[in-house]
From Swiss-Prot:
Transmembrane segments: none annotated. Keywords: DNA-binding, Transcription, Transcription regulation. CDD domains: PRTases_typeI. The lineage of its organism: Archaea, Methanobacteriati, Thermoplasmatota, Thermoplasmata, Thermoplasmatales. This is Transcriptional regulator GfcR. Contains an N-terminal DNA-binding winged helix-turn-helix domain and a C-terminal regulatory domain (or effector binding domain) resembling phosphoribosyltransferase (PRT) domain. It comes from Picrophilus torridus (strain ATCC 700027 / DSM 9790 / JCM 10055 / NBRC 100828 / KAW 2/3).
Length: 195
């Protein structure tokens, strides 16, 4: 999508299908606040953007390209685990977009796969029972984009509450200007900065 008008039209289309602002924000890789702002169509009266859309469709359409990104993420995970002198037990994918990276990381390293789904109303999320548990494991959390850090914060809290130890968060792109969330280091392949 190239323009705010296109983003607006896509957001309205999703809203009309019954999606919540949180679900729309996940799909469009925008913060919830930006989606609310977009749906209010206030951008017509404003001159400067308040958010950056991160699109990675060129990589996402082929498994081999996702695999290449996963290899970079694994390399980052191994670098950090060596610095911290600990073993990684599992890779956790945040639904939907973190799952392909965590799946490939699990496959390529022989570590366990955990799937986590955050609850759209900001309550506790849940771990899929079809995959590994977090209990007594050093967990690397993976997602595509971190915008406000809210989903990552809740994921970290839920891993801790469920008996796991979140040791690292890795994303393709971060919109944050911080290096950790809730005491857990966050690494990104790319960072965005508004100038």
């Amino acid at each position: 999508m190239k323009s705010l008008e296109e983003l607006y039209n896509r957001a309205i289309e999703m809203k009309n299908k019954g999606m919540s602002d949180k679900e729309i924000s996940t799909e469009l890789h925008l913060s919830v606040n930006t989606v609310t702002w977009l749906l209010s169509k206030e951008f017509v009266n404003e001159r400067s953007a308040k958010d950056v859309k991160i699109g990675w469709r060129s990589a996402g359409v082929f498994g081999s390209r996702i695999g290449s990104l996963a290899e970079i993420m694994i390399d980052i995970a191994e670098e950090e685990s060596n610095k911290m002198n600990l073993n990684i037990d599992a890779f956790l994918g945040i639904t939907i977009n973190g799952i392909p990276f965590a799946t490939l990381a699990s496959y390529m390293t022989g570590k366990e796969l955990i799937v986590y789904r955050p609850h759209p109303s900001r309550k506790e999320g849940f771990f899929s029972s079809n995959f590994a548990s977090v209990v007594n494991k050093n967990v690397v959390i993976m997602d595509d984009v971190v915008s406000t850090g809210e989903t990552m914060k809740r994921t970290i809290e839920d891993v801790k509450k469920s008996g796991g130890k979140p040791v690292l968060c890795i994303v393709i792109a971060s919109k944050l200007n911080i290096d950790e969330i809730n005491g857990v280091k966050i690494r990104a392949i790319m960072r965005t900065v508004m100038v």
